[in-house]
Each structure stands twice: as C-alpha cells, then as structure tokens.
Amino acid sequence: MSWEIEYKKKLRTPQEALRSVQSGMRVYIQPGCAEPETLVEALMERGPDVEDVEIVHMMTMGTAPYVAPEMEGHFRHNAVFIGGNVRDAINDGRADYTPIYLSEIEQLFTSGAMPLDVALLQLSPPDAHGFCSFGVGVDTSLTAAQCARYVVAQINDQMPRTYGDSFIHVSKIDAVVESSRPLCTTKKAEITELHTAIARNVAGLIEDGAVLQTGIGGIPDAVLPFLMDRKDLGVHSELVSDGAIPLIEAGVINGARKNFKPRKVIVGFIIGSKKIFDFVDNNPIFEFHPTSYTNDPLLIARNDNMVAINSALQIDLTGQVCSDSIGNQFYSGIGGQVDFLRGASHAKGGKPIIAISSTAKSGTISRIVPMLSPGAGVVTSRGLVRYVVTEFGVAYLHGKSIRERAKALIDVSHPKFRDELYEYCEKTKWLQRPAAQVVPMR
C-alpha cells in the first residue's frame, strides 16, 4: 500500500480521532509553539465522557482548558515544566508537577515508568516519501510518538519542515486530522535597562568561537545584540528564539569553529514568532533533535568554549540556586538548566552562567539571600555553580570557599541589601564585613 493511500485511510475528523481517548488513559500533548490546538479543542469536547484521564506535557502555550475547575475528575494535568497557563492549578492542588531534568523526560516514556496511551501531535504535511516533520517542536515529542500506543497527528500546512532527527512516517501515525491554522506564538520580552546592564556583563564573558545556549526572556534577548561584533559563534541549545536571527543573517553565528556538529545550529524546539518559524522552514543550518540529545551533558561537553546562560529566582550565599519555585509555590521547572551547566562545566573552555537581576518585586527584595526561602527547592547545587552575573558584575564561585563565595555574591548584590547580607555572615561567622564597610557603633 502506498503511503498516499494509507494517509487517506487514516483521515479523521477531530472528534473521531479523539474517541481513542478513554477513561483512565494517559495522554501526551506536544508542547510549546507546536501545541496541536485543534486536537486539544476536540479533547475538551471529549471531557464530559471520560474520567481520570492524565494529561502530560512539558509546557503548552495555549489556554490549557483541561485544568479548568469544571474539568476536575475528567482530566488531571501533570506538567514536567510549568507554564503560566497551569501554574495556578498546580498550586491550587488541581494539577501536578513532576520535577525532572529535561534530558531525562524521555526516559520516563521509554522505560515504561510513564507509559503513554495516546500522543497528540502537530506535524507538517508529508513529503514525497511520506515523512512528516515535527517542525518547531521535536523536543520530547518524537520519543513520545515512538512510545505511545496510539498516535493522533494534526497535519498543518503552516507547520515548518525542519531538518535533523525530526521526521515520522505516515505509517507510524494512527489517525490524521487536517487543520490549517497559525501556530502558537510568544511575544518578544520587553528589554529593560536592567536587562541590558546584566546582558552587558554576560556578553563580556563570551569570546569569538564560543558555542551558545540561551533560554527565552529579557536577559537572553538582551545578550544577543551585544554579540554582533563577535566572530564564528555556534549554537547548541534546547531552544532558539527570534533573537538569534540577526546574528545568523550577519554571519556571526555560523558554527565555523564548532568541533562538535560544525556549521549547524543544534536545537530541540523553537519558541517565538512567525518570523522564526519561517526562518527555520527548510533551513539546513538548523538541525533538530530530541531534548535527550540536545540536553545530554556528555554531548554538550563535546563543544569547546560552551557558554550556557541560564536564570534563577533566588541564590543563597553558598551558591545554591532555586529556579523552579518561589518558596513552596511552584513557578516553572528544572528544565535544561542543570543539563547545560553540567555540560558546560566539563567542556574545554566552558562557562556555565547564572544570570539574574539582583532584586525582584520592583527592587523591594533581594534575589541574593542568606538562605533560600522556606520550601524553595535547590535546582542547581552549590558545587555546580561557577559564574553568577547581575547588573553589578560577575561573581566566580568555582573552587571558592564558603567565605569567598559569600563575599563574591555580596559584591554583585544590590548595594541596599549588602548590610543585611553581611550581618548574616557575621552571625554565622562565615565572613567579617570589610573594614571600610563596618557600621560604627552608636
């Protein structure tokens, strides 16, 4: 049977395709900008007819209707990375959060620890050989499709065709739903003067020939424009967004000096606007892989001069990093931070960087704290942290004692909080305030 005939036989309406979801099943939804919204809408229509269906995904960009209070009992959401659309539901106890390294999520599927009944995907139309592309979202979805008992694909002619390990054949799909609609997009973060100040300090650590990993948000977006005078940069990252386009077009990012996968932008998924979607479409400089590959610390470490730039919510004076919760309120997830910091720390000339603003809540609280807030989780241990960058400078912690770490972190904290940080250090006998900063007794 030709793939064309097989494809036509598998065509279904969204409602027909989602009848595959039965009570008690576990359903995977392709995350990020590749979220199959037509299938999600049909899944919600199915909701009143099913009970105890677990929905698993990394981070979706849609409205997440499955966590609405009226869906309780029908759907239970389990996020391996928390987005703003499910944060309240998780902290209200109506949904779950599974903390895990991004590099290890696929192991849950392949090992049977988290068996998948149904995978809901969004793919490009098949090519002349019957292969559909995962487009902007290979991430954990290729492996999910390989492990799920039933695969439903939303075929969208607006999904880019991307290169790399990013294809699935029509024969591996059980139901096809054709739906042409724009992909989910994200707005570019507003770059503030604060972001620019932090970015300037980060950029000072990036040399010609460096290989970059950056996330999304104001700080990463602010770093990239500072690199327009660099030469032969490369990219090995879990994600890429719009900010990389000018550097690629200018030839700054060309991968010429990469010793691992030279001349290729290695990426797991794309987050951004239609501009970046169009840019990656049939663009051979991009090579997409599952995040078990992009985030493998051993592979990351093969990149000489690997620079990993990640952020955090809090850092204590010993160097412990919290990046997934605010106290006991879960905020995001572990994601790829540890994967890339570990990989960069083992790379020749590597630089693992935590870049944060020194304060939060309009400058009313310090992000550099004596102790992490009660209930906060340590995502990155003090032994792994090397560079901490704020708008006030760079603290280098690797190989430093607790006394030296505390001093370095206080030096890059906001000046208005330094006295109380020193007071804590004096009470714990970690560190004495420098003579010039001793507060005279009254």
List each language-model region with its residue ranges.
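Conserved alpha/beta enzyme-core scaffold
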Residues: M1-R442
